């Protein structure tokens, strides 16, 4: 009877280890995840507050975040390697690759909101998704995390988000 409980405990411990440690579960180590090369996320809707665009563009002098808020205010901020690593990790953490190929339109809604997402990875992979009055699972939470990343970046460069019309 004692031996049986030891086996059950060992099995539970092994299962818990697999669940809690992605490396043991066969997931790619953090440094092996594909890095984001370019990024574009845009929204539009019925009011001006919904017209926003967040981009990461590559130039000969490095990468820049290009942020357009309310179809009017534009910000161009240089990105460090640390910023890019953090953003690449965020894209992986959010599981945005699951959205690749999502292109849905609800034609019964005459006015509403839409989005587009385009990501290019250093390894050649890509994400292309869009929706008009249709959104993939977990949309609100995931795009909030994306906006938070760019707003934090703006704060680090000294932009007072309370002074912006958000």
Residue positions per predicted region:
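Gram-positive cell-envelope targeting signals
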Residues: 1-30, 117
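A short-motif feature that recognizes glycine-rich, charge-decorated loops
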Residues: 64-99
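Short amphipathic beta-strand/extended segments with alternating polar/hydrophobic composition
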Residues: 51-57, 75-79, 124-135
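Generic recognition of cysteine residues
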Residues: 19-23, 47, 134
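Short, well-ordered, aromatic-rich surface patches in folded extracellular/luminal domains
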Residues: 28-46, 90, 97-166
């Amino acid at each position: 009877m004692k031996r049986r409980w030891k086996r059950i405990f060992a099995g539970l411990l092994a299962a818990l280890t697999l669940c809690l440690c992605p490396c043991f579960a066969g997931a790619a180590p953090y440094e092996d995840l594909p890095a984001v090369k370019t990024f574009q996320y845009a929204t539009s809707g019925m009011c001006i507050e919904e017209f926003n665009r967040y981009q990461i563009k590559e130039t000969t002098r490095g990468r820049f975040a290009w942020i357009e808020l309310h179809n009017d205010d534009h910000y161009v901020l240089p990105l460090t390697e640390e910023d890019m690593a953090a953003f690449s990790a965020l894209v992986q953490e959010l599981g945005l690759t699951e959205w690749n190929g999502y292109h849905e339109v609800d034609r019964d809604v005459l006015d509403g909101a839409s989005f587009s997402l385009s990501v290019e990875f250093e390894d050649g992979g890509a994400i292309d998704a869009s929706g008009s009055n249709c959104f993939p699972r977990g949309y609100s939470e995931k795009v909030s995390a994306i906006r938070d990343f760019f707003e934090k970046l703006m704060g680090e460069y000294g932009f007072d988000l309370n002074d912006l019309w958000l």
